[in-house]
Regions:
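Dinucleotide-binding Rossmann-like beta1-alpha1 core, especially the glycine-rich loop
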Residues: 46-124
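Glycine-rich FAD pyrophosphate-binding loop
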Residues: 24-43
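Short beta-strand to alpha-helix junction loop
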Residues: 61-62, 89-98, 137-156, 300-306, ...
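Gly/Ala-rich phosphate-binding loop of Rossmann-like dinucleotide-binding domains
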Residues: 19, 23
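Beta1/beta-strand and adjacent pyrophosphate-binding region of the FAD-binding site
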Residues: 1-14, 30
Length: 378
């Protein structure tokens, strides 16, 4: 029996995850990307694999599965990853109350979390600002990669292990039945075609995307130069604004009180979708962010005012100032507007669109891809 073939369009994290899952299923896989390398949201994020941000049930389980796949891949390649866990710190009574409630909730959900008083936080994470610190909630689940390194090296890994073939600088402009077209007359065919085009709604199926409950999110990011060897975070660290951002926190009974306090004290932050996190890679660089602006089109300029707001808030819990910043940039990712967490469509027979992970691509893609291949594909 002839082996089934699959084409994946897009070499970001969703496309790479689909290529892996299809290969394991037994497909011969080719990946086409319009650029010389992946250069979209997949390389512009924190590199946080973030189960704590996912609600209990299918999404949390998917995040844990994705994390474990990252660990498997890192063990078989030169991709760096580290299960650092995460720390949410509290500097006022409302934040501390929410963290206490989340500890109870997460323990009930059998997550690996631990509530730390201020003394314990400082003993384990001495760079955390001690002034007004009440404590923190540590979760052991979270893992860090350097997205730039990981997304660059994953194609090589997939080729070596699964014989996935990559075709760069190939912009697919049309799909007809089982055939993709590149430029005037270059064509390739496969039994299955999977479109993982990220925030590019305009090239393939633009009429369909125009009807979908999907938009885009622009986020501004910053990264320090390599910090001194004694400047080590030891975990991914988040401030109180992050407690308002993730759906896994929404059931904390005191969250409305914290929301009210933040609205009174940080209305400019909430209006610009800002919450503040920091993650350190193997080069000792610290990635910091971020802002959230929603729409279909954006100005191609960064706002230094927004970057300053992020750094100002960061200094409430970490001693990182403007002088350390080496790079700033923005990323754009697709975001569903109907509350769903992924978009899986089949506009034609044996053609599938996978999109709309809403900024959780690093956290969910590998697990989601396995689920799609198991349940949606022949």
């Amino acid at each position: 029996m002839q082996q089934q073939s699959a084409i994946v369009i897009g070499a970001g994290i969703v496309g790479l995850a689909m290529a892996r899952a299809l290969s394991i299923k037994g497909y011969t896989v080719s990946v086409f990307d319009k650029s010389h390398a992946a250069c979209g949201a997949s390389v512009r994020n924190f590199g946080m694999v973030w189960p704590i941000g996912q609600p209990a049930g299918a999404l949390y389980n998917r995040a844990i599965r994705t994390r474990d796949i990252w660990k498997e891949i890192a063990a078989e390649s030169t991709i760096w990853c580290k299960q650092t866990g995460s720390l949410h710190v509290a500097y006022n009574a409302e934040e501390w109350q929410v963290l206490q409630e989340l500890e109870q909730q997460f323990n009930t959900e059998q997550r690996n979390v631990l509530l730390l008083n201020a003394k314990k936080v400082l003993s384990q994470y001495p760079l955390v600002n001690k002034q007004n610190l009440l404590g923190g909630l540590f979760s052991a689940d979270e893992l860090l990669v350097d997205p730039r390194q990981a997304i660059e090296l994953l194609p090589e890994y997939l080729t070596k292990k699964y014989n996935v073939q990559f075709y760069w600088n190939k912009c697919v402009t049309q799909i007809t039945e089982s055939i993709i077209t590149i430029g005037a007359n270059e064509q390739h065919s496969a039994n299955i075609i999977v479109v993982c085009s990220g925030a590019d709604f305009e090239t393939l199926y633009p009429e369909l995307f125009a009807t979908l409950p999907i938009t885009k999110c622009k986020l501004q990011m910053q990264r320090t130069a390599a910090m001194p060897t004694n400047f080590t975070l030891n975990t991914a660290i988040c401030g109180g604004l992050s407690l308002l951002h993730y759906s896994s926190f929404k059931d904390a009974p005191s969250l409305p009180l914290l929301q009210k306090k933040m609205q009174a004290e940080y209305s400019n932050y909430l209006a610009n979708g800002i919450h503040v996190m920091a993650a350190q890679n193997n080069l000792n660089e610290i990635t910091i962010g971020d802002t959230h602006e929603y729409g279909i089109g954006f100005a191609p300029f960064d706002s230094m005012e927004m970057n300053k707001l992020v750094l100002d808030y960061l200094q409430l819990f970490l001693p990182i100032t403007q002088q350390y910043i080496a790079q700033t940039w923005y990323g754009i990712y697709p975001k569903l507007t109907n509350g769903e967490t992924e978009l899986i469509l089949s506009p034609q027979k044996n053609i599938f669109i996978v999109n709309g992970l809403g900024g959780a691509g690093m956290t969910l893609s590998f697990g989601l891809a396995e689920e799609i291949v198991a349940t949606h594909l022949p």
